[in-house]
Amino acid sequence: MTMIKITDLDLTGKRVLIRSDLNVPVKNGVITSNRKIHASLPTIKLALKKSKHVMVTSHLGRPIEGEYNAQFSLQPVVEYLKKQLINRYVKEVRLVKDYLEGVNFMEGELLILENVRFNKGEKKDDEILSKKYAMLCDVFIMDAFGSAHRTQASTHGIGKFVSLACSGLLLQKELEALGKALCNPMRPMVAIVGGSKVSTKLIVLDSLSKVADYLIVGGGIANTFLAAQGKKVGKSLYEEELIPTAKRLLENCDIPILTDVRVSTEFSETAPVTMKAIIDIKDNEQILDLGDESITRILDILNCAKTILWNGPIGVFEFPNFRKGTEMISHAIAKSNAFSIVGGGDTLMAIDLFDISNQISYISTGGGAFLEFIEGKTFPSVKMLEKHALNNMN
């Protein structure tokens, strides 16, 4: 991928608009996880060093498009950015609600343009809206990896009309990390895919089966693979219609099959836990976590890995009685010398729970984008940035 980078440009005297991914969880006006803002800060700080006229925008939540709703305002993000930037990078951080007809800067301020989803036509990549975004700036910086797979006005459409578009530091890091894991991995390469359903991650599993030396499946997904081998799964969640798909994947890739599991007759954090061999599962029991023998086998594989990609928990880790598999695998990845990359909301919750964030090589900010990159899909915003790079070479 050839793109112009923010580090390539002299932004002196330029109006700069950064599309970040500041879509953070907010409860009662308070941000409950600042991970995405923290990841976006290096690009914002660099832009502020290079230009006196910097604007940042993002979506937040799922408001009704075209309607203002205070619940989805970027105001909590503004308050967080004030603490991070005032007196060191800027004098003020100001939220601008009405900006489509133009904005005015005061000296030493960073402008945060209100939630793009308050603008009619954002999600449909509306041409008129895209032109209005483009009129605001001389340089557009796309840094929202988490939205890079979407064809929307603030991530893609603006690029058709702005004179210059480049990638931010975060977008570049995301693409490089995923490329390192998927396009040219150090081997053995181990992929871990958890979650409840094969159907939601079918293309991901298919893509990873072609690049991974070992494909470890967990959660409800593993139950479908067990059923494909004729194993008992009791009343566990599995997808009978996808058994032929699971059989095909088992033939094409080394997928370690569980030998023992933790089961219960009820789905509860207070449910009694029984560890037993797969062959001993009763019809009224459901698989909720890995057994010790299965965990040991997976840890042996991870200990030899040079590249590890992880998406999705291995068991019902939200319940203390069924989190051992996810916990042990988390710590094994943290201790490994392999290049490790993780992505997906539940997976990030797990690494936060077990306090291993600082021991992971790269934590992706993308959920759907992370999965779509693994699937091999083309990102419209990346294609747009590549076109700008090509046009500037000619």
UniProtKB/Swiss-Prot annotation:
Entries under PROSITE patterns matching the protein: PGLYCERATE_KINASE
Pathway of action: Carbohydrate degradation; glycolysis; pyruvate from D-glyceraldehyde 3-phosphate: step 2/5
Gene3D superfamilies per record: Phosphoglycerate kinase, N-terminal domain
Pfam family, one: PGK
One GO biological process term: gluconeogenesis
Family matches, as InterPro entries: Phosphoglycerate_kinase, Phosphoglycerate_kinase_CS, Phosphoglycerate_kinase_N, Phosphoglycerate_kinase_sf
UniProt-annotated location(s): Cytoplasm
Superkingdom in the source lineage: Bacteria
UniProt keyword annotations, A-Z: ATP-binding, Cytoplasm, Glycolysis, Kinase, Nucleotide-binding, Transferase
EC assignment: 2.7.2.3
Residues reported to bind ATP: 201, 318, 344-347
Enzymatic reactions: (2R)-3-phosphoglycerate + ATP = (2R)-3-phospho-glyceroyl phosphate + ADP
Alphabetized GO MF terms: ADP binding; ATP binding; phosphoglycerate kinase activity
Binding residues annotated for substrate, in chain numbering: 21-23, 59-62, 117, 150
Gene Ontology cellular component list: cytosol
Similarity section: Belongs to the phosphoglycerate kinase family.
Assembly description: Monomer.
Name of this protein: Phosphoglycerate kinase
Organism encoding this protein: Blochmanniella pennsylvanica (strain BPEN)
Source species taxonomy: Bacteria, Pseudomonadati, Pseudomonadota, Gammaproteobacteria, Enterobacterales
